[in-house]
Amino acid sequence: PFYFGLYGGSAMAGFLESDPDAAPFFQALGYQPTARHLVYQCDLNDHHVPVSVRLMEIRRKMELRAVAQPDPLTWWWSTRYGRLESLRFLLGPKAGGLAAAGVTVVALDHYLSKWQSQSIGLTDLAVPKAEQRQGFGQALILGVMRRLRDELFTQVECHAPDGNEAAKGLLESCGFKQVDAGSVFQRPSD
């Protein structure tokens, strides 16, 4: 869909810094950057899963579940993901109960010829406030990446707002590397 951006990827990042003509063009027209998003990727062929006691404890108590789509299905979800293959992964207690974290996985098959890799995008990562800073987000992402590698995907992409240190730290702790950044431009009101 159009709203996944001009460059492809798992989310809208704005105009990428790797496109050197974009920023000068928009600034010459009076637009100013208003937000910046970082683009992270992880090569699953080279990925080494971090090991820690906390992650082992989470894996012992929690399980990864896949759900096809949200319930109830909303107009917003349908317009954003309806034409793409997507799946929601939840990390929840093996004994049952509410999920401690969730992320949506979006197939990026449209970019196979350009990127030369079987890629997947991660978006809509959510960890309830009460569950944050306990390793659930990291355990979820690492579990999803392990599953994707088993399904023969070779690259995972995720975006994070610049300035969101928690998201940046989480992605980097899972083996992601920043590969680009994008700026959203807006014309100042007169």
Regions found by a protein language model. Give the residues of each.
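Conserved acyl-CoA
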Residues: 1-5, 139-155, 177
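Conserved active-site alpha-helix within GNAT-family acetyltransferase domains
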Residues: 2-35, 138, 162-180
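Acyltransferase donor/substrate-recognition loop-hinge adjacent to the catalytic core
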Residues: 24-72
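Short hydrophobic/aromatic beta-strand or adjacent loop that forms the aromatic wall/cage
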Residues: 35-39, 86, 179-184
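A conserved beta-strand-loop-helix scaffold within acyl/acetyltransferase catalytic domains
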Residues: 73-126
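Active-site proximal loops enriched in glycine and acidic residues that flank catalytic Cys/His/Asp
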Residues: 93, 103-107, 124-126, 160-162, ...
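Active-site pocket scaffolds in enzymes
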Residues: 121-124, 145-148, 157-161, 169-172, ...
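Conserved acetyl-CoA-binding loop-helix of GNAT-fold acetyltransferases
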Residues: 127, 133-150, 168-173
